[in-house]
Amino acid sequence: MAPSHWRLILNGKSTDNLDLREAVGTLRKRGIQLDVRVTWEDGDAERYVGEAVADGVHTVVAAGGDGTLSEVAAALAHHEGDAATLPSLGLVPLGTANDFATAATLPIAPLEALTLIAERVAQPVDLLRIDADHGPHWCANVASGGFGTQVTVETDEGLKKMLGGLAYLITGMSRLGRIDPISARFSGPEFSWEGEFIALGLGNGRQAGGGQALCPEALIDDGLLDVTIVPDLDGEVAATLGTLVTGGKQAALERVAVRARVPWLDIVSQQPLTLNLDGEPETSRHFRIECVPARLRMHLPGECPLLGG
């Protein structure tokens, strides 16, 4: 039997990771044909995935954070083949927040993460397809808007490197006095809501922005996206909620959130609305978000909380 052929796509910011280098060597000694490609600029992940598909690679491994995972997943989804014919997807978490990996209980250590990919059969997983003014996008984890999105977009890269997830909290605290509500209309099957909101989560996965569990019950294999809308609140209540949400206090979120679970959602806003798609901001007045069932296959832990079984 021919050895398994993998293509690891590494975020260029993590080329100095010695643990990953050693782990790659270990997997090669175990008989896996493992090639490494490093991203340097926009479009590299798309190109590397295209080459992997053309080369008949069995598994594509994203080595990086949530943005790298989403880039690689999107590049796979752009191909016409279904999940069974495309390479499976694996993840070595090397980012600052690692929101998807945390919610999925994936191991952080590179050798453990690569070993899991080798040992676990890939499972069908959904992706979110987002249609907006500037063409279609794909999202593997969470699309977010409002307060949490501004925190993520504005968090300094140097601060993230030094402080990890704490950087998001510090940035969030600095914004508490200037939370501006956004007005929009949301509609989906048997769901409609219109008004001003300060935070929004559209979840294939559960958390984003450095640990904000906006969609705590979301599953990535149910064919549905979880919707969480935090309506505008007045005065100090809004500031307090912002602190609690950023600090991961889910009790505060549960008291005020509007929730739904739908296969698709339309969002219409009179003003430009920015959604953070796994770290990539996209601005539009109209979004259509669709959960595409079983778009890819992914290697995940046996008791992964994101799988419904």
UniProtKB/Swiss-Prot annotation:
Source organism: Xanthomonas axonopodis pv. citri (strain 306)
EC numbers: 2.7.1.-
Swiss-Prot/TrEMBL GO biological process terms: phospholipid biosynthetic process
Active site: E280 (proton acceptor)
Binding residue positions for ATP: T39, G65, D66, G67, T68, L69, S70, E71, T96
Protein name from the UniProt record: Probable lipid kinase YegS-like
Major localization listed first in the record, in broad terms: cytoplasm
Cellular localization per UniProt: Cytoplasm
Role, per record: Probably phosphorylates lipids; the in vivo substrate is unknown.
Cofactor: Mg(2+); Ca(2+)
Protein family: Belongs to the diacylglycerol/lipid kinase family. YegS lipid kinase subfamily.
Ranges annotated as spanning the membrane: none
Gene Ontology molecular function terms on file: ATP binding; lipid kinase activity; magnesium ion binding
UniProt cofactor note: Binds 1 Mg(2+) ion per subunit. Ca(2+) may be able to substitute.
Organism lineage string: Bacteria, Pseudomonadati, Pseudomonadota, Gammaproteobacteria, Lysobacterales
Gene3D superfamilies, A to Z: 2.60.200.40, Probable inorganic polyphosphate/atp-NAD kinase, domain 1
Domain DAGKc residues, every copy: 1-134
GO cellular component terms, semicolon-separated: cytoplasm; plasma membrane
